[in-house]
Amino acid sequence: MRLVVTGGGTGGHLFPGIAVACGMRDRLPGTTILFIGTSRQVDRIGLEGLGFRQAVIRSSGLKGMGTFARLRALAQLPLAVFQAARILGRFRPDLVLGVGGYVTGPVLLAAKLRGTQVCIHEQNSVPGLANRLAGRIADRIFISLPCGPSFPGARTRLTGNPVRGEILAAADRRRPRPSDRPPTLLVLGGSQGAHMVNSLVVAAVERMVADGGRLRVIHQTGRRDLDMVRRAYAKLELQAETADFFRDMASVYLQADLVVSRAGATTLAELAVMGLPVLLIPYPHAADNHQERNGRWYAEGGGAVLLQESLLNGNILAEEITTLLYNDQNLQVMGSRMRTLARPEATERIIDQCLELVQTRGR
């Protein structure tokens, strides 16, 4: 089996692809896998040490760009398709799986022109532009949420969002917090950070400490705000672990009691598997407002509380955190409901569908 996974640029796109690639290699140990992605740091760090082949093509996104940037992206498209075709010609894949992000478009188009079977996975409740276009040519379309996007029914499968194996394994090791340990708040702004989330949480924690609250904080800040957040917590003499990007999310999740996060689909899938309750602050400028729609599904299921960034300040967020963080029963109920929304079998479902496609083609 020779598999190409294409996508990336954010952890939300990359990590489901990694989950499927690792699962395929476990299922068929002789599988050779190539990732075609971006040159961004998250792709490089995320794939580090996994033993997959890697390639990068030059491509740019269209959505949310100005006129000049769009024209430049369109001008790059023929070259990107040519680069992708050359890479695919050398690798000769049996199947190409697109996991979202602008880099997928040229690769999937080149694959289809070569007669290679193509699948896509959509993590969000609203598909990105690349997947909306790719859905027209894909042989199989995998969606993550029951409230997910409308694609051609005969080719669409509800699979859930693949979660990396080390996080699935960690979910079985999660235990209640020891009574002598202060509760731990985990703060996630996505793989690239979120300035407003960082600022709001710092203000909220300052208020909580001033009111005598005991807590520990683990905070993924992104590169931009790392120093600011570290200085704020040091001034409070708070027990805190901060990083621009955590590589071992499984161990981070195991330490958390409550999460404050954006509403990216892959983060939500991981939190659901772990059974972690979450206060969600959706990114208000996300394409087609997909983060709010992602978060609403988990909030309606009882595992999350959905907050609007425009209505928040440090005091309000402190009250929301305090209501949950110091009430073990509330945390337990929300965590249990969050776990019922998980689809830990998503990776295996996608692999089954991919292998069925390849086997059908080989008959």
Where are these predicted regions, by residue range?
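Conserved nucleotide-sugar phosphate-binding/catalytic loop shared by glycosyltransferases and other
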Residues: 3-8, 30-76, 223-225, 310
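C-terminal alpha-helical cap of glycosyltransferases
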Residues: 343-363
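An amphipathic, basic-hydrophobic alpha-helix
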Residues: 66-95
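Donor-nucleotide binding loops and adjacent catalytic segments primarily
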Residues: 36, 41-42, 46, 50, ...
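A short, well-ordered alpha-helix in the C-terminal region of glycosyltransferases
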Residues: 330-344
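Active-site-proximal region of nucleotide-activated glycan assembly enzymes
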Residues: 31, 53, 112-172
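Short hydrophobic beta-strand element within catalytic cores of glycosyltransferases
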Residues: 261, 277-288
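Acidic donor-binding loop of glycosyltransferase active sites
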Residues: 93-95, 238, 254-269, 276-277
